[in-house]
């Protein structure tokens, strides 16, 4: 009982589900954000880095980014034997823009060696029926939508300059559930 955790980590859940370690790989799609480009506001959320949270490798294809990160993991004693990876399209708002852009991003993931699944980061006010249907049809065993839900309180959302409401967040969560998107 000495090493018993009070929670189940993502690592342990993925190991149990896939029978081996699965490593997340950050992928930078060069996405924008309506809270940075003037559509909703300028400057972004109070906590947002001007360069985003990704790797800064947006000028490279997903395949090139994938090779870079797999190479780094191959040299690390902790991850050198990892064979399965989760592609994490992380930086900024990856569902911002037309649905065809999201479809292109998802298509670019197909065929990456060792891809066990994908995760797409976005804002709750940038998903709709069409985009949710695209994500629900993703062909991988794992597919997750990572919604930036910093608060359920409108006063806090306004204070941190999120540019969306708690109702937007609720709508996005319900839409994901309706489509079976985790």
Question: Where do the protein language model's features map onto the residues?
Answer:
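Amphipathic repeat-derived elements
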Residues: 1-10, 110, 169-182
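N-terminal [4Fe-4S]-dependent radical SAM core
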Residues: 1-86
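Alpha-helical context
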Residues: 3, 21, 42, 81-85, ...
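Broad structural signal for hydrophobic residues in well-ordered alpha-helices, predominantly aliphatic
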Residues: 14, 109, 135-136
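Short hydrophobic/aromatic-rich motifs at helix boundaries and adjacent loops
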Residues: 38-42, 76-80, 103-107, 144-146, ...
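Conserved non-cysteine loop/helix-boundary elements of the Radical SAM core domain that shape
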Residues: 53-60, 91-104, 118-181
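A contiguous, low-structure linker/loop signature
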Residues: 68, 72-112
